[in-house]
Regions:
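Nucleotide-activated donor-binding/catalytic signature segment of Leloir-type glycosyltransferases, i.e.
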Residues: 57-79
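Short alpha-helical segment that forms part of, or immediately flanks, the ligand-binding pocket
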Residues: 79, 101-105, 119-120, 126
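Short alpha-helical donor nucleotide-sugar binding micro-motif in glycosyltransferases
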Residues: 80-85, 172
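Acidic donor-binding loop of glycosyltransferase active sites
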Residues: 83-95, 108
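A charged, aromatic-enriched C-terminal amphipathic alpha-helix characteristic of glycosyltransferases
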Residues: 134, 150-195
Length: 195
């Protein structure tokens, strides 16, 4: 499997962690940001939400004062929050999910729904914590478990480097060379001769 690359030279650890959690996403229903908002409404911890989308007004309407919405932000602001948040919240199910890897590249652990791509990018108990169901209770339990363990930001960073640009380029080059040498036609029936 060749994973999409993450710019680990841009997303780097820096500064001190603060008592905030971060959720970065397009604010659309399937991303499940409402789950994070409802869970953090109940536990009262500070949650910063970055992103825009059709659910922004709805999410603001249900959020308590401990939840702050910043809307869409440039990469510099995103990186700043990745660096200073205590953990990154990833409540949706994605095929891959770049944001958990960007967070880890900044030395930040991830609290993620334990399905889909997160299971390939986050190491439960090592670089983050999984929750088993997309329910408030399950996410609250994961935050509680996270608060009771110590996660090494250096290990998060090392894990993210497995998804860096250099590795991606190396894997793609090897794959293309292999296909050319073996004149292999794969899933999409690409004509290697005319590729």
């Amino acid at each position: 499997m060749i994973y999409p690359p993450v710019n680990t030279e841009y997303y780097t650890p820096e500064g001190e962690k603060e008592e905030i959690y971060l959720c970065l996403s397009r604010l659309v229903k399937y991303k499940k940001v409402d789950l994070a908002v409802e869970a953090f409404n109940r536990i009262g911890k500070k949650l910063v939400v970055i992103g825009g989308g059709e659910q922004l007004d709805y999410l603001k309407s249900i959020a308590k004062p401990n939840i702050i919405f910043l809307g869409r932000q440039p990469d510099e602001v995103v990186r700043e929050y990745y660096r200073k948040c205590k953990a990154f919240i990833f409540p949706g199910e994605e095929d891959f999910g770049i944001t958990p890897v960007e967070a880890q590249a900044c030395g930040t652990p991830v609290i993620a729904y334990g399905k889909g791509g997160a299971t390939e990018t986050v190491i439960d108990g090592i670089t983050g914590v999984f929750f088993k169901e997309q329910t408030e209770e399950s996410l609250i339990d994961a935050v509680d478990r996270f608060e009771k363990i110590s996660i090494d930001s250096g290990v998060c960073r090392e894990n993210a480097e497995k998804f860096g640009i250099e590795r991606f380029e190396h894997q793609m080059k090897n794959y293309v060379e292999y296909c050319c040498q073996h004149k292999t036609v794969h899933q999409n029936e690409i004509d290697i001769e005319n590729f």
